[in-house]
Amino acid sequence: MLVRAATVADLPALLQLALEAGSGLTSLPASEERLERRLQTVEASFAGTLTMADADYLFVLEDASGQVIGTSGVLAAAGLREPWYSYRRGLTVTASRELNVYRQQPTLFLTNDLTGASALCSLFLSQPHRHSLYGRLL
């Protein structure tokens, strides 16, 4: 197994992974044009020619035969060019002594608290390879 930086040459393999992942993995779109643009950004990021706001690092996992079987990525600083939304888990309390009511309700709050933080993205391992702890390499 080998983890390495993704390149434009990995486009066909990443497109196949994106198709396998389906629409739920929004950071790995099943669009050849979008993936190619992203891979160009990835190459520029590893070359050190982009600012933190634009840097996007994508890795691929190869098996012993050289086949790309998984991917993971890191955005250097999420949300510096477009909004980066996340959820914060909080608590909503409803109380009334007169009605003898006290209730705590776990609540998700939409925030931008992680703006500027690094973010893991595009984490996917092809179904036939989800064994032997290969996912830990990603």
Please report, for each region that a protein language model flagged, where it lies by residue.
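Residue-level detector of conserved, well-ordered beta-strand and adjacent loop positions
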Residues: R4-T7, E62, L75, C121
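A short, internal acetyl-CoA/4′-phosphopantetheine-binding micro-motif in the GNAT/acyltransferase core
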Residues: E62, L120-H131
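A short beta-loop-alpha structural element at the N-terminal edge
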Residues: L2-L14, S27
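Active-site rim helix/loop that mediates acceptor-substrate recognition in acyltransferases
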Residues: A18, G22-I69, G73-R81
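Conserved acyl-donor/pantetheine-binding loop and adjacent beta-alpha core of acyl/acetyltransferases
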Residues: A76-S122
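Conserved glycine-rich acetyl-CoA-binding loop
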Residues: D113, S126-L137
